[in-house]
């Protein structure tokens, strides 16, 4: 993940130093450095083939990235403008690295963990200034996926959260903020969907190829344009409520049960677009224009997949 983040920042014009936190001989470090830079060059070469930049620009981007050995970490961190920790998902290892970094950085520097699993408050106790610490979860490949999930802790200064949001927006990312909760937003939803897909293969519901086709051309197609909660509002929360009751009974599992918020919304008349509010508020929205915009985006998705076709007239 660290190498992908390095590409994202270097591509956006920032100088980046990746620090090797493991002690190595000079020869071992040289091998690691060559491997890291080679991977970055291959990444930029692929982006060049895809038309995002030209070879000269790729060289300029790679020139912004350096690799520092562990014995130079203190001096490197002392000059850092922002620190991302990206060591393996081991709590004590992360705490050790974060503690060491927080002792040598400028007191006004923001430190972020890129953990995908560990709660921010399980790490913040190792930080000298926990008010300037938060989790910043990237999705692989970090240099392509726009979304970045920001998870501040109990001690995180709200101004730091806003500063990180602005920084990420400045490099072309789309940040969202979520509470300190296991799984953030995407991994939590993703785990449910992936496990259900695997379960359907195991149950013989459909082949792996057809399930993936259903996701690409149905589920993913729709949700590239509409958010999950937005789509609930499109059809109405009542539809989800009754569909969930049927699935729970038919499949004999409470994993399909609608959460309490769905029935509360129904009781309060917050069904969705047809009542002017659901999870989102539509009261001041030009519904026809809004629908047209979303439907137009779906047409563009059809074109992207090569599935848009003229009507049959004969």
Task: Describe each model-derived feature in a short phrase.
Residues 12, 173-180, 203, 208-314:
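NAD(P)-dependent Rossmann-like dehydrogenase/reductase catalytic/cofactor-binding core
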Residues 1-43:
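NAD(P)+-binding Rossmann beta1-loop-alpha1 motif at the extreme N-terminus of oxidoreductases
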Residues 12-15, 129, 148-181, 193-221:
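Internal alpha-helical scaffold of NAD(P)-dependent oxidoreductase catalytic cores
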Residues 44-104:
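A structured beta-alpha segment of the ubiquitous adenosine-cofactor-binding alpha/beta core
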Residues 17-19, 66-68, 84, 112, ...:
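Hydrophobic/aromatic beta-strand patches that form the interior of the parallel beta-sheet core
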Residues 89-166:
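Rossmann-fold NAD(P)-binding glycine/threonine-rich loop
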């Amino acid at each position: 993940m660290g190498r992908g983040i390095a590409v994202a920042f270097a591509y956006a014009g920032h100088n980046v130093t990746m620090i090797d936190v493991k002690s190595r001989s000079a020869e071992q470090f040289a091998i690691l450095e060559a491997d890291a830079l080679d991977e970055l060059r291959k990444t930029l070469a692929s982006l060049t083939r895809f038309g995002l930049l030209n070879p000269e620009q790729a060289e300029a981007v790679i020139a912004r990235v350096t690799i520092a050995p562990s014995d130079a970490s203190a001096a490197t961190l002392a000059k850092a403008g922002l620190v991302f920790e990206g060591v393996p998902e081991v709590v004590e290892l992360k705490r050790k690295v974060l503690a060491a970094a927080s002792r040598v950085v400028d007191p006004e520097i923001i430190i972020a963990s890129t953990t995908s699993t560990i709660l921010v408050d399980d790490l913040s106790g190792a930080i000298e200034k926990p008010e300037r610490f938060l989790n910043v979860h990237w999705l692989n490949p970090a240099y392509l996926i726009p979304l970045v999930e920001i998870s501040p802790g109990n001690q995180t200064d709200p101004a730091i959260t806003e500063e990180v949001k602005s920084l990420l927006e400045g490099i072309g990312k789309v940040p969202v903020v979520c509470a300190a909760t296991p799984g953030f937003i995407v991994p939590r939803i993703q785990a449910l969907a992936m496990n259900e897909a695997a379960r359907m293969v195991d149950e013989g519901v459909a082949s792996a190829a057809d399930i993936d086709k259903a996701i690409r051309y149905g589920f993913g197609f729709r949700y590239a344009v509409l958010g999950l909660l937005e789509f609930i509002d499109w059809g109405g929360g009542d539809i989800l409520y009754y569909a969930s009751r049927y699935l729970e009974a038919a499949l004999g599992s409470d994993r399909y049960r609608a959460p309490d918020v769905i029935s509360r919304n129904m009781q309060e008349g917050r069904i969705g677009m047809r009542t002017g509010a659901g999870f989102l508020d539509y009261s001041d929205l030009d519904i026809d224009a809004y629908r047209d915009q979303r439907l137009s985006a779906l047409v563009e998705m059809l074109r992207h997949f090569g599935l848009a076709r003229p009507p049959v007239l004969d």
